[in-house]
Amino acid sequence: MSKIFVNPSAIRAGLADLEMAEETVDLINRNIEDNQAHLQGEPIEVDNLPEDMGRLHLDDGKSPNPGEMAKVGEGKYREDFQMDEGEDPSFLFQSYLENVGVQIVRQMRSGERFLKIWSQTVEEIISYVAVNFPNPPGKSSEDKSTQTTGRELKKETTPTPSQRESQSSKARMAAQTASGPPALEWSATNEKDDLSVEAEIAHQIAESFSKKYKFPSRSSGILLYNFEQLKMNLDDIVKEAKNVPGVTRLAHDGSKLPLRCVLGWVALANSKKFQLLVESDKLSKIMQDDLNRYTSC
């Protein structure tokens, strides 16, 4: 008579399968009970429902009565009229700008000049905004000018720290004296030229964003500083850089900019750390020399 031997590991595996099957059955039963929980307990009386629930009715295919629909408070149903994220114009505009940025990088890698790429891109963005964000009716140009004036007055009335003003005034006065009168206000009459100037300034600053420049330190040493340490957006840096005498004219001509002078100017106006570390008198002379050298070329 032959004997049948059973491997103990097979027995243990079979017991484990039985335990898993029992747990699965228990889980299914609990799910069924949870799904049928609304069938248990006391029945709900229709008369005891809240007042808003009494307005609910089954759709029989007929159009609802406008009088009854008007009684419902608009504030309770504002969420129903909110657009999805995909339908939000600002979300679509953000996606469009991301695609534009990718396209600019590709064109620059292909060897095209940034100034040419930027001028074309600006026109495309303006066209996109004009088509997808039309001006709302009922607002005249007078309202826009009034709002703009209000914002400008608000900016002018914002107090500035006296310490920042006193430390940066010396360098700015020296730079003004060195370069003569400010650049001509050609940008006020030619918007495309103004955009091209900003693009040229942004391009040159971006190329040397992490490059460190030498400045005189208060400890009789050398202070190394770069645009990246400003912790500012490139657009804000460009706006401040346009205030440096002669920079706008140099950018319009496509000449190289005195980036160390620009960095010192922007840092004096926006970085308290730079103001505390730099020697302002020596910095004024350095900025003056840089402006003289670049504007005389």
From Swiss-Prot:
<dbReference type="GO" id="GO:0039722">
    <property type="term" value="P:symbiont-mediated suppression of host toll-like receptor signaling pathway"/>
</dbReference>
<keyword id="KW-1223">Inhibition of host TBK1 by virus</keyword>
<keyword id="KW-0899">Viral immunoevasion</keyword>
<keyword id="KW-1177">Microtubular inwards viral transport</keyword>
<feature type="modified residue" description="Phosphoserine; by host">
    <location>
        <position position="63"/>
    </location>
</feature>
<protein>
    <recommendedName>
        <fullName>Phosphoprotein</fullName>
    </recommendedName>
</protein>
<keyword id="KW-0597">Phosphoprotein</keyword>
<comment type="function">
    <text>Non catalytic polymerase cofactor and regulatory protein that plays a role in viral transcription and replication. Stabilizes the RNA polymerase L to the N-RNA template and binds the soluble protein N, preventing it from encapsidating non-genomic RNA. Also inhibits host IFN-alpha and IFN-beta signaling by binding and retaining phosphorylated STAT1 in the cytoplasm or by inhibiting the DNA binding of STAT1 in the nucleus. Might be involved, through interaction with host dynein, in intracellular microtubule-dependent virus transport of incoming virus from the synapse toward the cell body.</text>
</comment>
<keyword id="KW-0946">Virion</keyword>
<keyword id="KW-1114">Inhibition of host interferon signaling pathway by virus</keyword>
<feature type="compositionally biased region" description="Basic and acidic residues">
    <location>
        <begin position="140"/>
        <end position="157"/>
    </location>
</feature>
<keyword id="KW-1105">Inhibition of host STAT1 by virus</keyword>
<dbReference type="GO" id="GO:0019083">
    <property type="term" value="P:viral transcription"/>
</dbReference>
<feature type="compositionally biased region" description="Polar residues">
    <location>
        <begin position="158"/>
        <end position="170"/>
    </location>
</feature>
<dbReference type="GO" id="GO:0030430">
    <property type="term" value="C:host cell cytoplasm"/>
</dbReference>
<feature type="short sequence motif" description="Nuclear localization signal">
    <location>
        <begin position="211"/>
        <end position="214"/>
    </location>
</feature>
<dbReference type="Pfam" id="PF03012">
    <property type="entry name" value="PP_M1"/>
</dbReference>
<keyword id="KW-0945">Host-virus interaction</keyword>
<feature type="modified residue" description="Phosphoserine; by host PKC">
    <location>
        <position position="271"/>
    </location>
</feature>
<keyword id="KW-0693">Viral RNA replication</keyword>
<keyword id="KW-1160">Virus entry into host cell</keyword>
<keyword id="KW-1090">Inhibition of host innate immune response by virus</keyword>
<dbReference type="GO" id="GO:0044423">
    <property type="term" value="C:virion component"/>
</dbReference>
<dbReference type="InterPro" id="IPR037199">
    <property type="entry name" value="PP_M1_C"/>
</dbReference>
<dbReference type="GO" id="GO:0039723">
    <property type="term" value="P:symbiont-mediated suppression of host cytoplasmic pattern recognition receptor signaling pathway via inhibition of TBK1 activity"/>
</dbReference>
<dbReference type="GO" id="GO:0039564">
    <property type="term" value="P:symbiont-mediated suppression of host JAK-STAT cascade via inhibition of STAT2 activity"/>
</dbReference>
<keyword id="KW-0922">Interferon antiviral system evasion</keyword>
<keyword id="KW-1225">Inhibition of host TLR pathway by virus</keyword>
<dbReference type="GO" id="GO:0039502">
    <property type="term" value="P:symbiont-mediated suppression of host type I interferon-mediated signaling pathway"/>
</dbReference>
<keyword id="KW-1048">Host nucleus</keyword>
<feature type="region of interest" description="Disordered">
    <location>
        <begin position="132"/>
        <end position="189"/>
    </location>
</feature>
<keyword id="KW-1176">Cytoplasmic inwards viral transport</keyword>
<dbReference type="GO" id="GO:0046718">
    <property type="term" value="P:symbiont entry into host cell"/>
</dbReference>
<dbReference type="InterPro" id="IPR049506">
    <property type="entry name" value="RABV_P-like_C"/>
</dbReference>
<dbReference type="InterPro" id="IPR004259">
    <property type="entry name" value="PP_M1-like"/>
</dbReference>
<keyword id="KW-1035">Host cytoplasm</keyword>
<dbReference type="GO" id="GO:0042025">
    <property type="term" value="C:host cell nucleus"/>
</dbReference>
<comment type="similarity">
    <text>Belongs to the lyssavirus protein P family.</text>
</comment>
<feature type="modified residue" description="Phosphoserine; by host PKC">
    <location>
        <position position="162"/>
    </location>
</feature>
<dbReference type="GO" id="GO:0039563">
    <property type="term" value="P:symbiont-mediated suppression of host JAK-STAT cascade via inhibition of STAT1 activity"/>
</dbReference>
<feature type="region of interest" description="DYNLL1 and DYNLL2 binding">
    <location>
        <begin position="138"/>
        <end position="172"/>
    </location>
</feature>
<keyword id="KW-1106">Inhibition of host STAT2 by virus</keyword>
